Amino acid sequence: KFVKKNKIFLIEDCSQAHGAIYRGKKVGSFGHISTWSFCQDKIISTGGEGGMISTNNKKLWLKLWSLKDHGKNYKSLFNKKHKSGFKWLHDDYGSNYRMTEMQAVIGREQLKSLDLQIKKRNFIANLYLEGLKNYYLKYDIFKKPDFNFQKSSSKKNLRKSNQFVHAFYRLNLFLNKNKIKQRKLIQQFIKNKINCGVGSCPEIYREKIFMKSKFYPKKRLLNAK
């Protein structure tokens, strides 16, 4: 409603959210365009590198198809009759963003087990949060998680929990800085053979290449983190 009212073009970044559900809808089904990453550390990978753009807008799809295939015109290639000889098909600029057949096969096979993988990720996250609950309930070292990661036995709560499913690309813990230093906590995790990192990527516009652009904001966009 907000997007329609304000005439906003919605692009979903689903790079780390394969299989997630929000308000009963799969992530990637809200926007005009959804982007997906399949590089080596994502929930689904296509052999190391890769990605995908999805849309239900035919006009956008035709443009995207052209961009990934050297600027070819889809209708000229498939719907137009040509004389014998060379076919003139490139109506625009584009590049080679085409995924190989082998990469697609790897991704499609992983897609079959996506639901099972999400269940397993939720189960593992539940184990961690159960083991750490004293740290946020008793000692106030972590902020209490604000997502529902447990499946309830009651039908009412089960329906509610199915409306929101976390993909758990990562399990994020928010620290109370007054209680513990971040570096010390990370060292404790590593000591116990638990892989632990810091935060997430900051705003991309802060890269040097964008600083030279006329689009660079005069002030930090705090809500874009």
Spans of features found by a protein language model:
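A structure-centric signal for secondary-structure junctions around beta-strands
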Residues: 30-32, 47-48, 99-101, 168
